[in-house]
């Protein structure tokens, strides 16, 4: 008997045609979802009119064979941030046996269409892959040259508090960002990772650290390289006081940051600082901590986070 989930979530974001405050154009949404994915109450009361979208995985965890698909169409001039309601769990793969040693994979596919002058931020909470869990995510982004896209990935491999490691589990990730130019669609950024086996132990991999995180920001084309170079220096300075190994580098039109260590909190704090700096660079309002995130460690108020 099969019991896999095949959940979908379709989101359309667009600016409102009317507003009580003519100085603020709010982003509103249309949503359709199937279990186990569910769009919770959406807020668009931010100072800049940004839409805040929480997505819930109502089953409480992912198992082998689950297939999740998220489609986002951000229309012209829309601005939004999307996150998961809670940390997500990937349980050990079902169906492992001598006849089927590979087990069953869980998969999540995300397709983002970001149109002209839009700003979309994809910032799910951490993913916890249990021992033996098999999880693959594929993210494809079509980004207009005038638009901005920021995404964060944060994964814990094994239940560290229970002294559990990933074991025979695997975490895979593929991020492909495309942009249009005079010659048609081209790769803006491509990033593929697999964390398993020797990569968990090697000094060129995680070096026995259980937490991995990445932040990618692809800027509007109008952002100057000089501004990005200055941003890179500031991002590196913001590592002060945090635990773990953090690197940050320039892309052709953006930045890429990596975290490896033992603390998801340190990773969140550093990514929050970088996120804040990207807003400052574009002269936008400072990030507001989402209602669904852990309030006991709000980095906008924590003494360890100066921003």
Swiss-Prot record:
Superkingdom of the source species: Bacteria
Does the record carry Chaperone as a key word? yes
One annotated GO molecular function is: nickel cation binding
Q: Which UniProt keywords apply?
A: Chaperone, Cytoplasm, Nickel insertion
Q: Where in the cell is it found?
A: Cytoplasm
Q: Which InterPro entries match?
A: UreD
Q: Which GO terms describe its cellular component?
A: cytoplasm
Give one Pfam family, short name only. UreD
Q: Mainly localized where? A: cytoplasm
Q: Does the keyword Chaperone apply?
A: yes
Function, in words: Required for maturation of urease via the functional incorporation of the urease nickel metallocenter.
SUBUNIT field: UreD, UreF and UreG form a complex that acts as a GTP-hydrolysis-dependent molecular chaperone, activating the urease apoprotein by helping to assemble the nickel containing metallocenter of UreC. The UreE protein probably delivers the nickel.
UniProt similarity note: Belongs to the UreD family.
According to UniProt, the name of this protein is: Urease accessory protein UreD
Q: Which organism is it from?
A: Prochlorococcus marinus (strain NATL2A)
Q: Give the gene symbol.
A: ureD
